[in-house]
Amino acid sequence: MEDISEDYEGLLMKYNVELHTDVDPITYIGNGSQIETLISNLVSNAIKYNKEDGHVYVHIYSKKDNMIIEVKDTGIGIPLADQGRIFERFYRVDKGRSRIKGGTGLGLAIVKHIVSYNKGTVKLHSQLGEGTCITITLPNKS
């Protein structure tokens, strides 16, 4: 998680967003680089689509035989009509804003693919103007 924080130092400064991490000491038996990609994509979006002086919270912990990854932001939120489509390849909620923020439109599709491949689940909670919380549950392979 420290590596991801360092990776986004410039982006955090550019958007004037603060990153808070709470990572429990857990052992995940699975593909670590996939998990790093998943977290990185979620954190990147949470920073880019946040409000100025916003916050991103990352909490990683274990519950029963699962690893839980929760990324929550104080950003712009996602309209209800778009929430069912944000994990589709190339889908963008606001195409004009997305051009300004950059990216390929693949980040959340990659997240969904990694989660599905690892037989996990994704839960989205978002309110327009209040932010978004994405919770990933991944079974700990043994």
Please annotate each region the language model reported.
Residues 23, 27-33:
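Conserved micro-motifs of the catalytic ATP-binding
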Residues 119-120:
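Conserved glycine-rich
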Residues 53-65:
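Short beta-strand/loop element within the Bergerat-fold HATPase_c
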Residues 11-20, 25:
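Short conserved segments within the C-terminal catalytic ATPase subdomain
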Residues 46-47:
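Short helix-loop "hinge" at the ATP-lid/N-box region of the Bergerat-fold HATPase_c
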Residues 78-92, 112:
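Short conserved segment of the HATPase_c
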Residues 73:
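Acidic ATP/Mg2+-coordinating residue in the GHKL
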